[in-house]
Amino acid sequence: MAFNFNWSPLMADAGFYTRAQELLTAALNKSPKPPIIVDDIVVTELNLGSNPPELEILEIGDLAEDRFRGIFKMSYAGDAFLTLKTCVQANPLNTYLLTRHPFTSPQPLAAATGLTIPLQITLSDIKLSGFVILVFSKQKGITVVFRNDPLESLKVSSTFDSIPFVRDYLQKEIEGQLRILFMDELPAIIHRLSLRLWGTEYSELETTSAQVTNPSLDGPGLDPLLNPPQDPVDASGNVLSISEIASLSLDSGVEMHSLFSRKNVLRLAALTDSQRTLSLFTPSIREVVFRAWTGSMEQADGPSGLVSPMSPPLSRTHSHIATSSLSLQDAASLASSSHSRPTPPSSGFSGYGLSMGAGRHSKAHARKRKKRVVDLRRRPKSADDMESVSGESAYTTTTSAVSVFSGSTIPEENNDDPVTPPVSPQRTIRRPTLRDRIAARDDAERNSRRGIPAEFGHDLPAVRTSPPIANDMARIIASASNLQRQLQQQQPADSKPLPSLQETAPIRTLRPSPSSTPQYPTEKPNASNNYTSSSSPSARDPQQQQPQQLSRPSSSFIMESAQNGGILEQAWMMKMASEIARRIQDEKMGGEDPTNSSSRGGSGGGFWERPSMRSHTPPPAYRH
């Protein structure tokens, strides 16, 4: 079966090419264009050529007088051509710079920007080959569908053929767009053309839609600005009455155009007032320069010399932080008004916060703020706070109460001046140091220490915290040697030498605390006498000790040595006094019972073997 295609009527019909150009232009601009094309693509020339396409019938599905459906194999290599016109943004130098390293590029300034150039492209030597499904109906027109991509090749001729890069780029982009055109847009274009040829209803519908899109008016168009608005105002914002509007001439177009709606003028005024600020976040108007206006006088000096209607002139406003008006009562007022309820502080916060005002002096309601400071820190004890203890009085503890005092009145700060730091109080509260605390504790222990037992008839004198000097020690040693000589003269011939001090223990000793007892350096024993201090290192070795014979001391010797000695000397004197008292009692008992004395002498100190008279308390030198 063979068919003859009459190609000449299509070429002879001028209206066909016009409609085809419009449809192709709409189809090319429908899809998104590449960024290099900055204008619409317009089809200026279209020619189908003199050579028709070759069709091979593969299948006929339906055949009738008013309808046809079949599958064809189409091939076309004719002289048809298509000319397009658009504008592109071409910059070959910028493309060259993008492909080179920045170190070697010359870095041009003006030539690196894009340049819009008109472009004309001609498509020719089109070769098509593919399978086509053709469906024809007088009611529905012609439908052509390509089962595969029919475009094999084409030739693209443009204004930039002398530039290889641009030529290749355009060839590639246009081929891609034509492939989309054949697969998607060309079937729709052919269908609409067929409807125009055979469908009368479709042609009438298109005519009606064109009239709606471009309405044709019988008379000339009316200017909407010539009709006065409902609330007309003049250029200065003054409302015009009906008589003033009627007095205006209808021929004076300038006067009539100056009538604007009051609502629109207010919106424009609000928009312009929003620019009279130094804020960085206000909306900006293009091609308009604004500056900050501070008052109405400066606004009138502007280029227009007019004040926007219904918009008050801007004035400089000042804000300040109002101080809290809540005052705290001091100690004196609390003491005087203990039976009355304090005033409620709710009304005191009326001026607190951010106060805005048009004037600079908007602090009339601000009140001075008072402060009450409570000192909770422990302060050092003074001599007046301590109570002296005499005799056998018990320990007493003195504590200083927490002091509550009111701070000095702070002068009101001037809000116009720069903020200054608060003034320090006149009285400086110093925290006691470690030395002060140690001295206070020593004073308390010295005042609360127990005295000498009442049987000696004297109280313990004040303790001297300073270490003993050489003169005091020499005096004590000299008086001790005199006592030894007196005791040797008064001692009977049959009495035995008394044991040393290291073998005895005191009846009552003072136990000073380790923290309050100063650590004095030990002194070497004197070679001229046999006396050895119990605090010396030689007292720790029993082999270096020699028996010392002591007798009843006098009260003057005890007081003199106690006044001149330190804490260790006082303990030693108490120890000596207890030893002497015991030995006197032993002598009395020995005088009454000589047999016991001889038996004790034979046993070598049997008196010290009595468990009732033996003290288990170690001497002070061996305590830990």
Swiss-Prot record:
InterPro entries per record: Mdm34, SMP_LBD
Coiled coil: none
Main localization, broad class: mitochondrion
UniProt keyword terms in alphabetical order: Lipid transport, Lipid-binding, Membrane, Mitochondrion, Mitochondrion outer membrane, Transmembrane, Transmembrane beta strand, Transport
Basic residues compositional bias, start-end: 360-372
Highest rank taxon of the organism: Eukaryota
GO biological process: mitochondrial genome maintenance; mitochondrion-endoplasmic reticulum membrane tethering; phospholipid transport
Residues covered by the SMP-LTD domain: 1-195
Location(s), subcellular: Mitochondrion outer membrane
Bias (Low complexity): 215-225, 332-341, 525-554
Membrane topology label: Multi-pass membrane protein
PROSITE patterns, sorted: SMP (PS51847)
Biased composition (Basic and acidic residues): 373-384, 433-448
Region named Disordered: 209-230, 332-395, 407-466, 483-554, 583-624
GO MF term list: lipid binding
GO cellular component: ERMES complex
Family: Belongs to the MDM34 family.
Biological role: Component of the ERMES/MDM complex, which serves as a molecular tether to connect the endoplasmic reticulum (ER) and mitochondria. Components of this complex are involved in the control of mitochondrial shape and protein biogenesis, and function in nonvesicular lipid trafficking between the ER and mitochondria. MDM34 is required for the interaction of the ER-resident membrane protein MMM1 and the outer mitochondrial membrane-resident beta-barrel protein MDM10.
Subunit record text: Component of the ER-mitochondria encounter structure (ERMES) or MDM complex, composed of MMM1, MDM10, MDM12 and MDM34.
Entry note about domains: Lacks alpha-helical transmembrane segments, suggesting that it resides in the membrane via beta-sheet conformations similar to those predicted for other outer membrane proteins and porin. The SMP-LTD domain is a barrel-like domain that can bind various types of glycerophospholipids in its interior and mediate their transfer between two adjacent bilayers.
Identification of the protein by name: Mitochondrial distribution and morphology protein 34
Lineage: Eukaryota, Fungi, Dikarya, Ascomycota, Pezizomycotina
